Amino acid sequence: MDAAGAGAGGKLKKGAAGRKAGGPRKKAVSRSVKAGLQFPVGRIGRYLKKGRYAQRIGTGAPVYLAAVLEYLAAEVLELAGNAARDNKKNRIIPRHVLLAIRNDEELGKLLAGVTIAHGGVLPNINPVLLPKKTAEKAAAAGKEAKSPKKAAGKSPKKA
């Protein structure tokens, strides 16, 4: 029998699980790190089980869901950052998040029924309420004809 106590009568220390008793313990690696994600795979898996969405939850389900949530968060944050930069701000506020979501076709469709607190509304003026463009052009043309400089410049030559 060897000295580690793995003989017929000897037992391994509790929690040794496949390594020699008293050997160096490997550092634990989270499933988020293994998947290369920032979002917590373990916590999402716990929520899936606790929520009773199904009797059984596969091992890949929380990893996939964490990846999808991380992608959506990154997409919204990137667009909100662009909106903040467009408004010459360094900090993202709820208004920037709303502008980012509502101006993006796919995110707008996904989050159509979502209300964002302190987000405000999209700037929108009904075209009927805007002044007529033809009236503006006619008024501008009329002003040009009555301008004294223009009239002086187009005087006929004396013969």
From Swiss-Prot:
Q: Which domain of life is it from?
A: Eukaryota
Keywords on this record?
A: Chromosome, DNA-binding, Nucleosome core, Nucleus
| Residue ranges of the motif SPKK motif 1 | 147-150
Q: What is its main location?
A: nucleus
Sorted alphabetically, which SMART domains does this protein's record hold? H2A
Q: Where is the composition biased (Basic residues)?
A: 11-29, 148-159
PANTHER family linked to this entry: HISTONE H2A (PTHR23430)
Designated name of the protein: Probable histone H2A.5
Native source organism of the sequence: Oryza sativa subsp. japonica
Organism taxonomic ancestry:
Eukaryota, Viridiplantae, Streptophyta, Embryophyta, Tracheophyta
